[in-house]
Amino acid sequence: MIRSALRNFSTMASFNPTSCSPFTRAVVNSMKKLYPEYLADKSFDNNGLLLESPFNFAERQKNSVLLTIDLTRAVADEAIERGDSIIIAYHPIIFRGLKSLTLNNSQQDSLLRLAQNGISVYSPHTAVDAVPGGMADWLLDMVTGPELTPGSALPHTRSTIHPEQNPPPGFENAGMGRIATLEQPGRLASVVNKLIANLDKPNGIPVALPQGKEIIDMPDIRTIATCPGSGSSILMNNGKPVADVLVTGEMSHHDALAAIENGAAVISLFHSNSERGYLRAVMRQKLVEALRDEWDAVRTQEAAGVGGDIGMIDWLSDSNFTVSVSERDQDPYDIRTIRVDTFST
């Protein structure tokens, strides 16, 4: 169908490329539909298209996307080696204003090399936190199961801690943070074990408990709140915890103290460990499904400017693409145990 449309346009003017590759544009359009930029916390966030690399058809990249939490030098190398068109980096690599772009700074070096290789960068960041079915819901699902799933291990109701005041259609439950109210009290030990299993952290996870308490001493959990990344501003309200158990990536020392002084438990997963699994578990498939229709639409739209360029016709006739999760993206922290007797004096 696309090839037929392109042939019909073959007598028109020569192709006038968009500023970035048509495939990159389709990916960005898809991400905006899945995770509306409007929902991001603009009080501090810098989400959106952060690096738009010009499209050169003769040196075009593959129609492929690489998903990552952090755009490190290792991930940039991975994308260049793979020949991806665009990186979806959850955390914005450009967060504050840049006064220069030099090779002396590792992040700027990555941006320059990506631009040189025709690879764009898009960051959805807190829009992913806010959407229904986003990271906050994903974290809560690990413990409770989805709210409306029959036979859920922990029957519950859930709500948004900070609801979006004017959500776009289809995103009525959007906002920051989620809180579940259990129909029957649960055990903290069960919450911890489920997170360890679902996040594949056999060495354990950090847990802050009220002084004098052990995990097995907290069998009457009624409410569980989640916030990916840094959760203090969402999970604490005027110095008080919003739930019996707070699950987040990290919480400041003083906020954790305030939480446990008020009887809550804090489960800190390390910042990006509360986010990374979402890419493979949820985002990848969502983007694949959205991109199928969007890439068809963009290819048809681009047909109008192709002219008689057979190479461009063949390229735009190909509906195939790939969406992959980075193999080199990882949290900077890990839990290690070292036996004292392995050291020689």
Where on the chain are the PLM-derived regions?
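Active-site catalytic microenvironments in core metabolic enzymes, especially phosphate/sugar-handling
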Residues: 2-345
